[in-house]
Curated annotation (Swiss-Prot):
Keyword Methyltransferase carried by entry: no
Protein name: Nucleolar complex protein 2 homolog
Positions of the UniProt region annotated as Disordered: 23-84, 98-145, 669-747
SUPFAM superfamilies the record matches: ARM repeat (SSF48371)
Disulfide bonding pattern of the chain: none
Principal cellular location given in the protein's record: nucleus
Tissue: Ubiquitous.
One of the record's GO cellular component terms: nucleus
Length: 747
């Protein structure tokens, strides 16, 4: 110990043996250590002086300074007493040795907090995060920016809380969870990660969406307005509620999420439930113009392309929004709906025709909301139709003709005829009647050939619809009667057709169709229907006898020239009803006491006749019922045919089929005596008796011959078929007769 504590000599005073025994400790190292100790001592003294200047002198300050210096002295004594242990502490626990007075003062002063010089303002996201973290129940708070998984228990708790008493904080939680559920359906991973909640289970998704669709709107309405108002038809804007300021942001987020959900659903039943929920949320959408435009855009798409029930619900939402916000939304929505209508009318078939008719009627109802706005759109689009027709008439090219003779053009004519017939009483739209009727007449006269008779019939129906409701005379009958003069109904058809022609879904006939018998059958039926429909609208007119005179003459001329019994029967029945109605009007006119120039008296007389009814109107009502029933049966028959499960034909293997065929042939050639006895009954009374299969064939042949005979008689042909028994007799030949030869006297 004495040797260790003795002062160390310098290197130059040591011998070689002493230097090697000293453990390679140089004097420079000891000098460096001494200098380091001096620096630490000066630093500690400076820190003590600084702390003494900061803090007021007192017993607590002196106590802290004494503890620090005492601990430091203990470490220095440990270094002298046990240098090996001190070295061990340096290598393994350096923090214990690097102790200064500042550390002790920092620990003692830690409970005290000093404010920074500048304060930062909190952002909206931080505020939301703080509110959300406070609103979450204990045990569900997770790490920062980590979404909370939604469970069925949470959804049930939200449902019970909303039914009992909905609060703004609870509504905020439900909206955040609903947004997370919608984000998962759209596949937006970034949006789902930014949400506060996470919906990963399909059962939780269904429960949450069902709760929001069924219960949330009613609870929100109760929270805003309390009791339901007595006048349920009156629209209550949620902005009038005193709580609207607290709920406005959450309601806006919820409406955006609902529109996104309606856009991504594929199941018709679920989409229908969401659309019904949207219909109840219309007052909230009216408060936010941006969300309302998003909603209307989506509803127009569903109205034009969705399933039938979805189309109806989407239209109800559209008309409800436009009824309350005509100035803001009616004009753009009418334009968008017309564009979608034209786009969906490009092709027409029996399956798409009801949907096109639905779009016509609903678009007409939208145009009826404001006649002044409707006039602007009607004038623009009717003028566009007139420009297409003028180009086709002036150039005469095939391309320009195709721009007129297509389904889109024809359905647009139908639409505006329906609109003007519905709003014809409005003085704003009356100036458009004459241009529209002239466009339709020009469309008929563009190519007046037999191939475009179906298109002519569509135009005639549009003119009839226009003339029925507005009370304006339009010369429709000449375009119908002209066909009787152009078509030869007595001409024998070039080929037989397998099915009738549906004139309601075609615009043009092919050259093959013009040679078929079904073409003339369907054409005559369509002509009789068109005459009946137009004359039904004029049956109460005081000038009906004079109006139908050209028609009566043309029908009588047809009956004199036509030789087909079926055609004559249809025309004769129509002619009788027209003449009966003319005689009825003449008998009523004889008892009239007013002059024909008295317009008021004439209108009153025609109104009375319409209310009482005429023979032609009663016949038309009965005919219309039968025709609608035929159409329904045809549609239902097609549906049954589609749903019918035809039996499968199970083909046998080649080996099995050969074995069975050999067995059948073997049994066939093994003749018994009974078969020989039965074969004697083949001839009876000198006339061959046919087997049962041949007898059935004979009956079928007789029925076919009978049908062919009827059809030939209708076409003016008198040829008859040959019976199978007659063919058999002809093959047998007549019995030979022996006659005496008579020789003349000259031989």
């Amino acid at each position: 110990m004495a040797a260790s504590r003795a002062p160390r000599r310098r290197l130059e005073d040591l011998s070689v043996d002493e230097f090697l025994a000293s453990g390679f400790e140089s004097g420079s190292e000891s000098e460096l250590e001494g200098a380091a100790e001096e620096r630490r001592a000066r630093g500690a003294a400076w820190n003590r002086e600084r702390r003494g200047a900061r803090t007021s002198p007192g017993p607590a300050g002196r106590l802290r300074k004494g503890r620090a210096s005492e601990h430091k002295d203990q470490l220095s004594r440990l270094k002298d007493r046990d240098p090996e242990f001190y070295k061990f502490l340096q290598e393994n626990d350096r923090s214990l040795l690097d102790f200064s007075d500042s550390d002790s003062s920092a620990e003692e002063e830690e409970p005290f907090h000093s404010l920074p010089d500048t304060l930062e303002e909190a952002s909206e996201t931080e505020e939301d995060g703080g509110e959300d973290s406070d609103a979450l129940p204990r045990g569900l708070r997770s790490k920062k920016n980590e979404p909370v998984p939604v469970t069925l228990a949470m959804v049930e708790r939200w449902r019970q809380g909303s039914r009992h008493h909905l609060t703004p904080r609870l509504f905020h939680e439900v909206v955040q969870a609903f947004r997370a559920a919608v984000a998962t359906t759209q596949g937006e991973q970034e949006a789902a990660e930014t949400c506060r909640f996470q919906v990963a289970d399909s059962a939780v998704f269904n429960a949450l969406v069902t709760f929001c669709i069924r219960d949330l709107c009613g609870c929100l309405q109760k929270l805003l307005f309390g009791k339901t108002p007595k006048d349920s038809n009156r629209l209550l804007l949620p902005s009038s509620s005193p709580l609207w300021g607290k709920l406005r942001v959450d309601v806006k987020s919820y409406l955006s999420a609902v529109v996104q959900l309606a856009a991504c659903l594929a199941e018709a039943t679920v989409s229908a439930a969401v659309l019904q929920h949207i219909s109840s949320l219309v007052p909230y959408f009216l408060t936010f113009p941006k969300q309302c435009r998003m909603l209307l855009k989506r509803m127009v798409v569903l109205w034009s392309t969705g399933e039938e029930s979805l189309r109806v619900l989407a239209f109800l939402v559209l008309i409800r929004v436009c009824r309350h916000k005509k100035e803001a939304f009616l004009g753009p929505i009418l334009k968008q709906m017309y564009i979608m209508y034209v786009r969906n009318c490009k092709f027409t078939s029996p399956s798409t025709l009801p949907l096109i008719s639905f779009m016509q009627r609903t678009l007409t109802e939208m145009l009826a909301l404001d006649p002044s706005v409707s006039y602007q759109h009607a004038f623009l689009y009717i003028r566009q139709l007139a420009v297409h027709l003028r180009n086709a008439m002036t150039t005469g090219k095939k391309e320009t003709h195709q721009s007129v003779y297509n389904w889109q053009y024809v359905h647009c004519l139908y639409l505006w005829c329906r609109v003007l017939s519905t709003l014809g009483s409005s003085e704003i739209l009356q100036p458009l009647l004459y241009p529209l009727s002239q466009i339709i007449i020009g469309c008929i006269k563009l190519l007046p050939t037999a191939r475009f008779y179906p298109l002519r019939m569509h135009c005639v129906r549009a003119l009839t619809l226009l003339s029925q409701t507005i009370g304006t005379f339009i010369p429709v009958l000449p375009f119908i009667l002209e066909i009787f003069q152009q078509v030869d109904f007595n001409r024998r058809p070039g080929r037989m057709s397998s099915k009738p022609i549906n004139f309601s879904v075609i615009l043009k006939l092919s050259s093959t169709n013009l040679q078929e018998k079904a073409y003339r059958d369907g054409l005559l039926e369509q002509l009789c229907d068109l005459i009946l429909e137009y004359l039904h609208s004029q049956a109460h007119s005081i000038a009906f006898p004079e109006l139908v005179l050209p028609t009566v003459l043309q029908l009588k001329s047809f009956l004199r020239e036509c030789k087909v019994a079926n055609y004559c029967r249809q025309v004769r029945q129509l002619l009788e009803k027209v003449q009966e109605n003319a005689r009825h009007i003449e008998s009523l006119r004889q008892s009239a006491t007013f002059s024909v120039s008295d317009r008021t008296a004439v209108d009153a007389w025609e109104k009375q006749v319409r209310e009482e009814g005429t023979p032609l109107t009663r016949y038309y009502g009965h005919w219309k019922k039968l025709r609608d029933r035929e159409i329904q049966l045809e549609i239902s028959g097609k549906e049954r045919l589609e749903d019918l499960n035809f039996p499968e034909i199970k083909r046998r293997k080649v080996e099995d089929r050969k074995d069975e065929d050999r067995k059948e042939l073997k049994d066939l050639f093994e003749l018994d005596s009974s078969e020989g006895e039965d074969s004697t009954d083949f001839f009876e009374r000198g006339v061959p008796r046919l087997p049962e299969a041949h007898q059935g064939l004979k009956e079928d042949q007789e029925e076919e011959d009978k049908e062919e005979g009827d059809s030939d008689s209708e076409d003016g042909d008198t040829d008859t078929g040959v019976d199978l028994s007659e063919l058999w007799q002809l093959a047998q030949g007549a019995q030979d007769e022996l006659e005496d030869l008579q020789l003349s006297e000259e031989d």
